[in-house]
Amino acid sequence: MNLRKNVIRSVLRGARPLFASRRLGIAGRRVLLATLTAGARAPKGTRFQRVSIAGVPVQRVQPPHAATSGTLIYLHGGAYALGSARGYRGLAAQLAAAAGMTALVPDYTRAPHAHYPVALEEMAAVYTRLLDDGLDPKTTVIAGDSAGGGLTLALAMALRDRGIQAPAALGLICPWADLAVDIEATRPALRDPLILPSMCTEWAPRYVGSSDPRLPGISPVYGDMSGLPPIVMQTAGDDPICVDADKIETACAASKTSIEHRRFAGMWHDFHLQVSLLPEARDAIADLGARLRGHLHQSQGQPRGVVK
């Protein structure tokens, strides 16, 4: 294990008591997460514009020299309660640059001010409005990390069930997709330096509210995976949430839905946020971007390059 990776792991472990402490409050932990996400710096020359789509604030992210080959709709993480579009726009910019796309990062309403299904319905409204305004779904991908990864999968299921044109592909980074195990406090502990199962147990009820946590809109691992766009998924071996990805992969195999799953051994939840510091994170973002871009070519009927 290299020195830089060791240092980052130690920093995250040092921050864990603050994230786990309810005494800090939601506002305090939002500030703490914003400090960590700031480590994902956008490529130099990236342009940002704040817009509104279907009444939802959105960060429009244009990486430098990015080809206008497609649109990345990026749903940020943060346990449905802590993250923000501004805080995650650096990560979205890195992925957009790797994929050669422009990114849109919606600021969905967070828990506990809004429970399920508010965020899901807002994202469905944003996507539908974009289609109405001329967005081509064949050159569009939806991606997200952690809670945003679960929301990405739930959104794709909702679009399918409503007969709305699907995007070309989905990108899932360490998806939090089974909140039922957290309501029941049965998530296993692994070696993640930051994430503890007890944190998931705290945050899941804030989003679930009085709903059934096994609803596919909340925990898409319990939903029907058939008829979904191709999925590109990346996970971390030390992340206790990685078991959700295993359930997704198993369900996709059963329904014959295309899925590419790459697990990074010895890495932690959302290590992609250290893209400006860690070679492993840069490799992950470059690989995810290339694979998502490849699905655009495939959906347009163009020859698809081999992605290794």
From Swiss-Prot:
SUPFAM superfamilies: alpha/beta-Hydrolases. GO terms for cellular component: plasma membrane. GO terms for biological process: biological process involved in interaction with host; response to acidic pH. Keywords: Hydrolase, Signal. Gene3D superfamilies: alpha/beta hydrolase. InterPro entries: AB_hydrolase_3 (IPR013094), AB_hydrolase_fold (IPR029058), GDXG_lipolytic_enzyme (IPR050300). GO terms for molecular function: triacylglycerol lipase activity. A motif (Involved in the stabilization of the negatively charged intermediate by the formation of the oxyanion hole) lies at residues 76-78. Pfam families: Abhydrolase_3. Its EC number is 3.1.1.-. Residues 1-40 form the signal peptide. Disruption phenotype: Inactivation of the mymA operon causes altered cell wall structure, reduced contents and altered composition of mycolic acids along with the accumulation of saturated C24 and C26 fatty acids, and enhanced susceptibility to antibiotics, detergents and acidic pH. Also impairs ability to survive in macrophages. The active site is at residues 146, 239, 269. PANTHER family: AB HYDROLASE SUPERFAMILY PROTEIN C4A8.06C, ACETYL-HYDROLASE LIPR-RELATED. Required for maintaining the appropriate mycolic acid composition and permeability of the envelope on its exposure to acidic pH. This is Putative acetyl-hydrolase LipR.
